[in-house]
Every structure is written in structure tokens, then in C-alpha cells.
Amino acid sequence: MIISSLAFHYVESFGELAEKIARWLVPGGELVFTVEHPVFTASGSQDWHYDQEGGIMHFPVDRYFAEGQRNTVFLGEQVVKYHRTLTSYLNALLQSGFAITGVVEPTPSEELLRTVEGMENELRRPMMLIISARKP
């Protein structure tokens, strides 16, 4: 089993990586990974649009189908991420011989929604994506 958490969106060629992973895994081996959701990485800014009073208006989605490099800030540092569509993630896995076994767009738990201020805004757009696949 290979598990990756929030790393593949820093890799320029996911297709090449998927092919390598397929070679490394034995038949029946599994790949489970999380990435920032393509809706979240599309625009590059990764922030809400705010009104004049500072209230959240909406999350911008722009250039979704324009795959490639995005320069953004993460934890106060400039980083390079690579945006790709959901179709590109899934097709790269399928073309590398994987069978897709799961696709999840996680949402906050009821407890988080009750206890963390502003968490309800995380229901307005997907931020993360979890994909699982098996090598036949």
C-alpha cells in the first residue's frame, strides 16, 4: 500500500508518477492519496472573495481547465503547486492500469461544524479530495 497526504499537487507530472507507482505496487496493491481539490487550486489565490465589510461572498473558481503551475502562499511562504482537473487525476490512474476504488470530497463533521467558528464555510466549496485505487 502506498499512502500520500497532500503531496501530489506539488508534482508537475502526475501521469508519470502514477506510472511509477503502478510499477512499484504488486498486483492487488493499493494507492490512497489526498490532494487539494481542483476547485480549490484552480484560481491559484485559494482565498474567498470578501465584501466591503469583510464578509465572505464566494470562493472564486477560474481557469479550472487551464492546467499547470500555480504560484501561491502556503503558511506564509511562496510555493509552486500544479493544478489539474479531476478528470486528469482519474484518467492518469486509469491509463496507468489502476482500478479506481473510491473518490471522496470530505466535509467537516457535525462536531466541527458546532465547535469551530467559520467551519460552516467549508461546506460552500470542496477543499480536499481523497482518491483510492488498486492495481489489478
Model-derived segments and their meaning:
Residues G68-Q69, V80-V103:
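Short alpha-helix
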Residues S96-F98, V116-P136:
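Core SAM-dependent methyltransferase catalytic element
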Residues I3:
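A conserved beta-strand element that flanks and buttresses the S-adenosyl-L-methionine
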Residues Q69-T72, P106-L123:
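Class I S-adenosyl-L-methionine
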Residues E30-G68:
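Conserved class I S-adenosyl-L-methionine
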Residues L6-H9:
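Short catalytic micro-motifs in class I SAM-dependent methyltransferases
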Residues G15-E30:
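A short glycine-rich, Lys/Arg-flanked "PGG" loop and its adjoining helix->strand segment in the class I
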Residues V35-W48, V73-S88:
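Acceptor-substrate binding/catalytic loop of class I
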